[in-house]
């Protein structure tokens, strides 16, 4: 699963996801992509599940690029522990995804198969997404 090798700080504030994505809104690598339409925190497990679903649907043909990375630690306290006595320990990693962000890109497969594969991947994610195709520039 994806996680940073090292971080500047062990724990992070919760924060909020305001506005649309500033960068990463266009296809840079592949021909087809999956774009986020809602703001949400996507966990490393969800990214991995989507990646597996996409690769399996493509039958290992073509290439997949993951354009988001879980760099935010989420800490939780154990069950049935009283309030106070500090913040819990980091449990898992999430990526903050803004609307308009391209999350996955694929190439080397037919358009129908690409749409099907990305739809299977989108089913593993907790947000509404959109299938996008690289526009042909004249």
From Swiss-Prot:
Residues 1-21 are annotated as: Disordered. GO terms for molecular function: rRNA binding; structural constituent of ribosome; tRNA binding. Keywords: Ribonucleoprotein, Ribosomal protein, RNA-binding, rRNA-binding, tRNA-binding. Residues 1-19 have a biased composition (Basic residues). CDD domains: Ribosomal_L16_L10e (cd01433). Part of the 50S ribosomal subunit. Belongs to the universal ribosomal protein uL16 family. This is Large ribosomal subunit protein uL16. It comes from Granulibacter bethesdensis (strain ATCC BAA-1260 / CGDNIH1).
């Amino acid at each position: 699963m994806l996680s940073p090798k090292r971080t500047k700080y062990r724990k992070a504030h919760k924060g909020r996801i305001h506005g649309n994505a500033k960068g990463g809104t266009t296809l840079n690598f592949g021909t087809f992509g999956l774009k986020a339409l809602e703001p949400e925190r996507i966990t490393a497990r969800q990214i991995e599940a989507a990646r597996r679903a996409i690769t399996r649907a493509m039958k290992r043909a073509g290439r997949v690029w993951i354009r988001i990375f879980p760099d935010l630690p989420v800490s939780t306290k154990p069950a049935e522990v009283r309030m106070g006595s500090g913040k819990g320990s980091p449990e898992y990693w999430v990526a903050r995804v803004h609307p308009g962000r391209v999350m996955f890109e694929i190439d080397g497969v037919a358009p129908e198969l690409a749409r099907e594969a990305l739809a299977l991947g989108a089913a593993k994610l907790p947000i509404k997404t959109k299938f996008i195709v690289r526009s042909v520039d004249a």
